[in-house]
């Protein structure tokens, strides 16, 4: 399997439930230079990207200093990542996507960049315009029922009404939060 998937089993097994989309994400990253993971906040995009692409530097564009650098000097910012990176919350620096296009055109290795973002419309507009044909898009939603069953263990399935009350967001299950107080 490609070197872009250096899965840290310890971290993956203890801190993250196996997501059903992992095989799809691996396949997309082996075919496209950019993979964009979209979905609602707290659905597990960052955890998935960081746990699957452990050999890539991670940059959160939520961080004000990182975002300022990316916005003020996009070429300088991207020059640090000639071998690729994970850019989390890419919608916070949407112009960066245009600069990524030229980098990917010069060096189109599969799985080079992983982008994550929560604002579907804004992000998809940028990606579809600047990275058309260069990026695969994966929509990550909160847990499926099957994923929550794996988390609970096969003997501890919640009934449907309990499951609906608890919800499907990973943080609730991961940290065993009270769902009525967590959201």
Regions found by a protein language model. Name each.
Residues 1-183:
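Phosphate-binding site recognition
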């Amino acid at each position: 399997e490609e070197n872009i998937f250096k899965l840290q089993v310890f971290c993956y097994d203890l801190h993250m439930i196996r997501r059903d989309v992992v095989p799809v994400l691996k396949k997309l990253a082996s075919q496209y230079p950019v993979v964009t993971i979209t979905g609602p906040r707290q659905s597990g995009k960052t955890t998935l990207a960081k746990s699957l692409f452990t050999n890539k530097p991670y940059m959160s564009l939520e961080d004000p200093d990182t975002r300022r650098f990316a916005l003020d000097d996009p070429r300088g910012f991207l020059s640090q990542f000639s071998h690729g990176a994970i850019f989390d919350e890419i919608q916070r620096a949407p112009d960066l996507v245009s600069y990524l296009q030229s980098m990917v055109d010069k060096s189109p290795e599969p799985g080079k960049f992983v982008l994550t973002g929560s604002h579907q419309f804004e992000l998809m507009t940028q990606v579809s315009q600047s990275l058309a044909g260069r990026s695969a898009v994966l929509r990550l939603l909160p847990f499926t029922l099957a994923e929550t069953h794996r988390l609970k263990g096969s003997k501890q399935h919640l009934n449907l009404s309990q499951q609906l009350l608890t919800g499907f967001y990973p943080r609730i299950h991961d940290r065993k939060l009270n769902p009525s107080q967590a959201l």
